């Protein structure tokens, strides 16, 4: 589930991100985030916060919208977050665009 190339370090503070699309309910997405938090914590990380955004479809460049990405970036900077985990598969360019925008290592499920 979590990319084996990116190892989560013990006590690493992580933020989780998911998009609620038209075929998902908020409750389903919360269940997915709870599972992702459990996986991260099993790997030794501390899941600090979850961000969600309702979109018809994910943004092709950054998966989430510009405002949400800015909100995540501000939180990451203010709380010294080590890693951001998206609860979906991202393209290589999306991962790069997100990491560049929020100045934090970003991985996907």
Could you say what each language-model-derived stretch is?
Residues 1-109:
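N-terminal accessory targeting/assembly segments
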